[in-house]
A protein has these predicted regions:
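Catalytic cores of Mg2+-dependent Asp-rich isoprenoid enzymes
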Residues: 1-52, 63-69, 73, 87-95, ...
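Short alpha-helix boundary/capping elements
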Residues: 57, 61-62, 82, 99, ...
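A short glycine/serine-rich beta->alpha loop
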Residues: 59, 104-105, 170-172
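Portal/gating segments that form or line small-molecule/metal binding sites
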Residues: 77-84
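Short, surface-exposed loop/turn motifs that are enriched in glycine and acidic residues
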Residues: 81, 104-111
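Acidic/His metal-coordination segments adjacent to aromatic residues that form catalytic metal sites
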Residues: 94-104
Length: 215
C-alpha cells in the first residue's frame, strides 16, 4: 500500500488525467480488497466476500455498475482500451491466496498476480511500452507490500526474497515515459524493502531521477 503523499507524487508522473484516474480507481479497488481480507476472521467468509467482488467486476462487462463507488470508478475510468471487468476481476482472485493456511512459494506467486494484473492494466491505459517490465514490477510491488505486513518471519522472508529479485530486474530496465508512474511504484517498493523511511529525501530524489531518466 502506498502512503497518500507518495500516491500524489506517483500520479503526477501519469501521462495525462485519464491515466491518473485509472490508476486511482485501481488503487481504490485494491484498498477495498485489502480491507476485505484484513477484516475477515474466517477464511470461508473471506472467500465469499472476495468472490462477490470478482463476480461484480466481471458483470461490468455486460451491465452498468451498481451504486457502489469503487465499482462505479472502475466502470468509468478503467474499462476502456480493451480492458475488461474480467481482467480486473483477476486482482480480486489473487487476493484469495492470502486466505490459505500457509503462504508457501506457490501461494505467494498466486498472490503476486494482484500486482501483475494491476500494473499490466494500468500500463495498458497509460500507453506504456511493451518493453516496460510491468509484470516483474507488479509482482515485486505486491510481495514487498505483503512482506511488510506479515507476522510470520519465515513467510515474510519468502515474500521478501521473491520481491527483491523481481524489483531488481524491473529497476535495471529503462522505462518508457508513459510507464514511469508504475516504475516509480516499483522503486518505492524497493526502498521499502531496503528500510528507507517514508518521507526521506532519498525516496523523493530516487523517483524524481526515474521520472527524468526512466532508470
Amino acid at each position: 500500500v502506498i502512503a497518500e503523499p507518495e500516491r500524489r507524487l506517483v500520479l503526477a508522473y501519469a501521462p495525462g488525467a485519464a491515466a491518473g484516474q485509472a490508476l486511482s480507481a485501481l488503487w481504490a479497488l485494491d484498498d477495498k480488497l485489502a480491507e476485505t481480507v484484513r477484516t475477515t476472521s474466517e477464511p470461508m467468509l473471506g472467500q465469499i466476500r472476495l468472490q462477490w467482488w470478482h463476480d461484480a467486476l466481471v458483470k461490468l462487462d455486460g451491465a452498468p455498475p451498481p451504486a457502489e463507488p469503487v465499482l462505479e470508478a472502475v466502470a468509468r475510468d478503467v474499462l476502456r482500451d480493451g480492458v475488461t471487468g474480467a481482467a480486473v476481476g483477476e486482482i480480486a482472485q489473487a487476493w484469495q491466496a492470502l486466505l490459505q493456511e500457509e503462504l508457501d512459494a506457490v501461494t505467494l506467486k498466486a498472490f503476486a498476480q494482484r500486482g501483475v494484473r494491476l500494473f499490466e492494466i494500468a500500463g495498458t491505459l497509460a500507453g506504456a511500452s511493451p518493453a516496460d517490465p510491468l509484470a516483474l514490477a507488479g509482482e515485486g510491488w505486491a510481495l514487498a507490500d505483503l512482506a511488510g505486513g506479515l507476522s510470520d518471519p519465515r513467510e515474510a522472508a519468502g515474500a521478501r526474497m521473491i520481491a527483491e529479485q523481481a524489483l531488481a530486474e524491473a529497476a535495471a530496465r529503462r522505462w518508457s515515459r508513459n510507464g514511469r508512474a508504475l516504475g516509480a511504484m516499483a522503486h518505492l517498493a524497493r526502498m521499502d524493502l531496503a528500510g528507507v523511511p517514508f518521507g526521506s529525501p532519498r525516496r523523493t530524489g530516487r523517483v524524481l531521477w526515474h521520472r527524468l531518466t526512466g532508470k
